[in-house]
Amino acid sequence: MNTTRQWILSLSLALVSFLATVRPLDAATNRFHLSVLVDFIDDALETHYTPAKLDKMMALFREMGIRRVYWVHLGGAREGMFWSGQGSNEKSRSTSASLGGTPIKAAVRSARKAGLEIYGYLKPYEGGMSYSLPAGSPQAIEKPGPSRKGGPVAVASNFVRQHPDLRIRRRMTDIPAGLDSIPIQRIDLVKSDDRPTRVRKEHIEIWTSPDNYRYERRPTDFDFRDTVEQGRVLTLRGLNLTNKYVLVTTNLRGKDGDFANHATRLIRAFGPNHIQLPISVATDYCVWKPKRNFRTYGLEFDTGGYRAKKIVLDVDSSNGDRGFIAFCRGRNEYSPGALCEAYSEVRQHWLRLLRECLDAGVDGIDFRVQCHSTWSDEPFAYGYNEPIIREYRNRHGANIPIVQFETNLLAEIRGEYFTQFLKQAARMIHQRDKRMQVHVNIDLASPEFSNRINPFTYPRNIKFDWQTWLGFADEVTFRSLVLRPAELNSHAMSQKVISASGQAGLPIHFNRYLNQAGQDFEALRKEIQIIRNSGRFRSFILYEGKRLIGPDGAGSVRLRGKYGTMEQWKKLTRQMAN
């Protein structure tokens, strides 16, 4: 009998101990609810925010029926970027000052006043934006940053600016020594098909620049050949171009040309003995800066959109913003701003950002890997930092050349480092009795979506081991740019993630970009109802707050109205409560 009592007592104590480790959801959020993601820098770049205006934002969220706010934190004024660095403007700097330099602290205070939960939202790989300033431009001279082909990164965190060599590194085994001094002796212009073209020798113009700023025409003679390979190829031979930046256009006019191809396939450059050289290309496209002008400004190289962007070479280029293709020798050695997870200094930096959120008093932390810092025309060439190479050889062979590395094995090593960081983060979060949430990117985990997503918006050559993460996380963000709510039941990977999260006892939150949900409240309402009625999700995350809340013209903020009036949101909230 005593033995039985002791056994029952021991079991009871063990159960109490176990329950003490379970981090319960707030009672107000233990049923289906609405959440919102606030990338506050977008709001602050548009209008100056004071504590009172921030209070009004949170009060409006609460009135709409929202119960949780996710607040993006990139480090505040200490890290520069959009608050005090190259990406800031007068409104964002004044907002930062009025909110004490760390807006997330003010956000927590305002959320508390409104009776809202608030989670910090961290994007570890978000260290700099994937666009640069033309090297010869006044802006680049005034605001130098980490180097890129074409010029310095326009916006980067202070940590990245101080440690540019800790960014994710490209394999550089294909870059010959002395490449910058090799003269360009031949250029191939490659059409996507073999149909005849109107482009002739007399139509082609070559422009150059020493610093990617305000290109100038360079009268150049060359031999011209029009041949057909897999597609039609115009070959320019007998060149001797030593210029750093070279641009090819035509003097043809009109908006309808016939010589087109994807930008990365449109042009090839050769040195002596017809040896093809590695190059980076540019045209009119730039992230966040849709048009670049080669006559009055400069170009963006290796921006990540050129693999899919089709360029028509023989349209009117007199305005400088279309009808051209440019290149420079070589490739970017590092990603624009994403840091490599294998360095302990990087992981400690990420933990500092986490600590700032916890010190601000947030209720939890959500982690996302998708970012704006990895855009490249060759995303799968990255991930070859020295610690990764060293660990690969320790495991698989000391003398293995980098060109023979198996990318799946490389991805496993990198993924282990990132999971190590998340485990460290989990310990820190749970020591504060807060909750940890992790994104599972459905698109990235689904092979069938590989051609439907932008491969450069995620670090590649890395295994994001979401199934392991479920073992130490408390909640899950379900993220997809491709799937609609109505498609979830028929999508195998979605069901796998939902099932695994359910077996782990983790609430799932459905993240949805408002512009992808439709152009009005009714379309959005239907999607919210589908997610709610599925019974598998805890909340619907409205991404993002700036589409809902904006300046009212009288010194405060209001509901914008495009995605519903306040009465419509209140009615929806009442319906969900039943």
Task: State what each model feature region is.
Residues 38, 321-337, 437-453, 494-527:
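Active-site clefts of carbohydrate-active enzymes
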Residues 57, 75-123, 353, 406-432, ...:
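Aromatic-lined substrate-binding rim segments of carbohydrate-active enzymes
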Residues 61, 66-74, 466-490, 503-578:
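Substrate-binding cleft of secreted/luminal carbohydrate-active enzymes
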Residues 66-99, 326-327, 373-385, 485:
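Aromatic-lined carbohydrate-binding/catalytic grooves of carbohydrate-active enzymes
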Residues 82-86, 126-138, 152-157, 161-165, ...:
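Active-site-proximal loop/short-helix segments
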Residues 117-129, 366-370, 409-460, 506-517:
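Aromatic-lined carbohydrate-recognition surfaces of secreted/lumenal glycan-active proteins
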Residues 126-142, 437-485, 520, 526-534:
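Substrate-binding cleft/loops of secretory-pathway carbohydrate-active enzymes
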